[in-house]
Amino acid sequence: MTNTRKTHPLIKIINHSFIDLPAPSNISAWWNFGSLLGLCLAIQILTGLFLAMHYTSDTTTAFSSVTHICRDVNYGWLIRYMHANGASMFFICLFLHVGRGLYYGSYTYFETWNIGVVLLFVVMATAFMGYVLPWGQMSFWGATVITNLLSAIPYIGTTLVEWIWGGFSVDKATLTRFFAFHFVLPFIVAALVMVHLLFLHETGSNNPSGLISDSDKIPFHPYYTIKDXLGVLLLIMALMILVLFSPDLLGDPDNYTPANPLNTPPHIKPEWYFLFAYAILRSIPNKLGGVLALVFSILILMLFPLLHVSKQRSMMFRPLSQCVFWFLVADLLTLTWIGGQPVEHPFIIIGQLASMLYFTIMLLMLPTVSLIENKLLKW
């Protein structure tokens, strides 16, 4: 008798993706973040769905509808804070997942990597629009500042911004369309995830050594399903500790004040996971230059397959590249800190130096150090 798992047209797709999938025998815990991102997406879609049942996307009632969810809906506070902090967990996993890809040379899987960068952009857009929905002060002013950046585009900028706003300022039309997009984008993300996995399974997973592992594969189930289950346990534990003990730790107190177009908050800043990009944006005095730097700070990831000049794929056996990689991590943490600081001395110059270093490390230092290591191999 044939196994249904291997013959059923639908179940066999799942079987080839999650059960009988040949996986390298030596992949470490850094390979857990793919499944954790899938879990984060599922949590966000489910909690978001329940929030959408009670939320109203109207400027007069949006803020009070969120208050109503927290006060009157059964476990509404839990759903709301799981959704808000779930986004933070999502981005922590995203950054670690991308960092893993950079460290171990996973970007040489060209299609998988580029789809991943597109996914990063779409998730960032989704998170930005979600931040606008509670219609607090930071929601309103964040939306105003970020959408206004598009006015830097020559010729069509102003028209484009007013088209996105649906008027001459961020108002009811903006909130309604942001809610619509925020609702639909996670499903587009889910579809892109399928494409991401499709391309990954064309080549198989990379591994810490960066060497071809075709001769040493093990089935995904039970080895990596049990390993993923541990990651899931730790992620849910971290999320619930955050949600139940300090749900507002990563939020902005200004967002508990209803949006007021006549009163600007002293420091407009996005959520913590956008601060590095915000710092890069602010470090350039020119508006268009800042916008280009902001976009390029993420888009630069697409250049990594082209900038890879090392004879080895992974950084596992490249101590010089490892040093530069950790410089980059430290620089990103510095940028994140600067993004949350006011625009004054000495933060301005620190931000400018950190932004310059960010692009220098990626475009110049990593390839140069790789070439030096290639030379050292011959000695």
From Swiss-Prot:
Q: Which Pfam families match?
A: Cytochrom_B_C, Cytochrome_B
- What Gene3D superfamilies does the record point to? Cytochrome Bc1 Complex, Chain C
- Recite the other comments: Heme 1 (or BL or b562) is low-potential and absorbs at about 562 nm, and heme 2 (or BH or b566) is high-potential and absorbs at about 566 nm.
Its name, as the record gives it, is Cytochrome b
Which family is this sequence assigned to?
A: Belongs to the cytochrome b family.
Q: What is the species listed in this Swiss-Prot or TrEMBL entry?
A: Cynomys ludovicianus
Note accompanying the cofactor annotation: Binds 2 heme b groups non-covalently.
Q: Which GO terms describe its molecular function?
A: metal ion binding; ubiquinol-cytochrome-c reductase activity
Q: Which InterPro entries does the protein's record reference?
A: Cyt_b/b6_C, Cyt_b/b6_C_sf, Cyt_b/b6_N, Cytb/b6-like_sf, Cytochrome_b, Cytochrome_b_C_euk/bac, Cytochrome_b_N_euk/bac, Di-haem_cyt_TM
Q: How does it assemble?
A: The cytochrome bc1 complex contains 11 subunits: 3 respiratory subunits (MT-CYB, CYC1 and UQCRFS1), 2 core proteins (UQCRC1 and UQCRC2) and 6 low-molecular weight proteins (UQCRH/QCR6, UQCRB/QCR7, UQCRQ/QCR8, UQCR10/QCR9, UQCR11/QCR10 and a cleavage product of UQCRFS1). This cytochrome bc1 complex then forms a dimer.
Name of the coding gene: MT-CYB
Where is heme b b566 annotated to bind? Answer: 97, 196
Q: Which cofactor does it need?
A: heme b
| Residues bound to heme b b562 | 83, 182
